[in-house]
Amino acid sequence: FREDEQLDERPVLALLAGSRRQEIKDNLPTMLKVATAYPGHQPVIAGAPGLEPEYYRQYIGDADVKIVFGKTYPLLSHSDAALVTSGTATLETSLFRVPQVVCYYVAAGRLASFIFRHFFHTKYISLVNLIAGREVVQELFGVRFSYDQIHDELGRVLNDHAYRSRMLDGYDEMIRLLGKPGASRRTAAVSYTHLRAHET
């Protein structure tokens, strides 16, 4: 994979910015700004199906960032960490045991955070935390979606070995839950609740 995509020797930082144009527009610029602040890692974007490289290049500009299409799983298998929008990508990232920061832009952030916390009957937006029933990964959305908070959390994920280890332990706990009887039904129910909560 590294040779095919002409990646250098630096550890890979995966950017999974969603699949819809608006979602990518809202999230990718901040994710790129954070990722390029860590030059010891090589940012690689998982391109969404149906989108062309030119769409991403308007956000990348001259930055040293690669894009891959149809290779999300190989990308994750070679990644040291990831910035991920909410959705199934958070679950996929955890199954590859890649430490992650979940970050998701929501318009009118303060209002969105208030509504989410008070009117939806779930505490989390990522499938990892929803399935585990606790905070395994940080969720930076609404008022918490900012360059500073994402930058600081990524730094912790990259450099705090004890923190990374606790996150991986949380992944293992979640995977054990998925392996119990009724896991498919439970995961489907969690996914359905998650999707309904984020319908527009």
Regions picked out by a protein language model, each given a short descriptive name:
Residues 1-196:
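Nucleotide-activated sugar donor-binding and catalytic core shared by glycosyltransferases
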